[in-house]
Amino acid sequence: MNFPLIANIVVFVVLLFALAQTRHKQWSLAKKVLVGLVMGVVFGLALHTIYGSDSQVLKDSVQWFNIVGNGYVQLLQMIVMPLVFASILSAVARLHNASQLGKISFLTIGTLLFTTLIAALVGVLVTNLFGLTAEGLVQGGAETARLNAIESNYVGKVSDLSVPQLVLSFIPKNPFADLTGANPTSIISVVIFAAFLGVAALKLLKDDAPKGERVLAAIDTLQSWVMKLVRLVMQLTPYGVLALMTKVVAGSNLQDIIKLGSFVVASYLGLLIMFAVHGILLGINGVSPLKYFRKVWPVLTFAFTSRSSAASIPLNVEAQTRRLGVPESIASFAASFGATIGQNGCAGLYPAMLAVMVAPTVGINPLDPMWIATLVGIVTVSSAGVAGVGGGATFAALIVLPAMGLPVTLVALLISVEPLIDMGRTALNVSGSMTAGTLTSQWLKQTDKAILDSEDDAELAHH
């Protein structure tokens, strides 16, 4: 073991201990996460300045930090399936009639796809506005290696899925395999399976009340139990964020970021426009955008740092029910669907931007209205199966680009700035699903106005 490596690990452990002292304070989770975020950025910058992003010491150190960072993300992935299963099951079992189920899913999914369609258009717009193209981005050895890795990872799962097959892959044939997250579309399959189970519980309640009551009591117990598990993992968020931010900041190559600067700026401009679109949609439907963003801010910061839409599901549901007055049934649906269907950032904005950048290299005019219409259509439809765990955007791009007959090499070239942009995209995905839930709740006139209008915001889960 070399000395610098040990020193880095010691400093990291000291930072974790320092962060652990915040548990004695009456701080909200959002505040602790913010402290972790700042510490991670500062520590990451220090490491970057001392060692430079390519040094072996730094790479070795990051592997140790990953125990905390990636370990945390894996714990989040651990709770996603039980959470989606329990939330949807209890949400459906609480509906008094199964006909509401159709309405809720139709409106939620409709809103998600509609916002993704707008996001794709915004992506086309900003990319053309900045005149970004893939020409002149050099493919070095590192990129080629990355491309091969990406292709072997994803392409087998994606490229042979046509749209009908994609839709078919949502329907669960082995719910236990889907609970293991075996397929990219597992989350949706679990949602469908849980919804069926919930409807069956309602039918049972009608036909045989005592048994039905017992099943519903069991479902409620399961839901409370899983939520306790979720809170446990949530308490680790600040530490995970500290480690993840250290890794992103220390390992990001400044030359790459400057070289791809216009892409980063264009991406964030597109993201800001989409946040404005969410605000406008809410405003039209009687929810003050400022109030909405103030109330969901902790969830967005969490999504931003964790870079996982699926991992944000627990906080997402909490914010909708306890701050925006959305009933639990709608909130659980919007959060679970939103982690897979119609992610505005990862599956809407990003693939559209990439397609517009690649088009000129193969002699397609990216301003051609027919081409744009086809692109937006394909992006919207294929956004239905992007798994909500980090790297979903790469996945979306690998569905959209081949479908448009475009090469996928650009995906590898942009990977160096991927984490930087992915943070903003994930926040947008999560805002999209909360917007869908809030709008659905408004349309069905089920919003609890007292909660929505209250100025003091319920503290989001952290005990």
UniProtKB/Swiss-Prot annotation:
Homology family: Belongs to the dicarboxylate/amino acid:cation symporter (DAACS) (TC 2.A.23) family.
Encoding gene (name): tcyP
Organism: Escherichia coli (strain K12)
Gene ablation phenotype (knockout): Disruption of the gene decreases uptake of cystine. The mutant cannot grow on S-sulfocysteine. The tcyP-tcyJ double mutant is unable to import cystine. The tcyP-tcyL double mutant cannot grow in the minimal medium containing L-cystine as a sole sulfur source. The tcyP-tcyJ and tcyP-tcyL double mutants are completely resistant to both L-selenaproline and L-selenocystine.
Biological process terms in GO annotation: L-cystine transport; sulfur amino acid transport; sulfur utilization
Function per UniProt: Involved in L-cystine import. Low affinity L-cystine transporter that is mainly involved in L-cystine uptake from outside as a nutrient. Is the primary transporter at high concentrations of cystine. Probably functions as a proton symporter. Can also transport D-cystine, cysteine and homocystine as a methionine precursor. Mediates accumulation of the toxic compounds L-selenaproline (SCA) and L-selenocystine (SeCys). Can also transport S-sulfocysteine and is required for growth on S-sulfocysteine as a sulfur source.
PANTHER family according to UniProt: L-CYSTINE TRANSPORTER TCYP (PTHR42865:SF5), PROTON/GLUTAMATE-ASPARTATE SYMPORTER (PTHR42865)
Induction, per UniProt: Transcription is controlled by CysB. Highly expressed in sulfate medium and repressed in cystine medium.
Name under which the protein is recorded: L-cystine transporter TcyP
Superkingdom of source: Bacteria
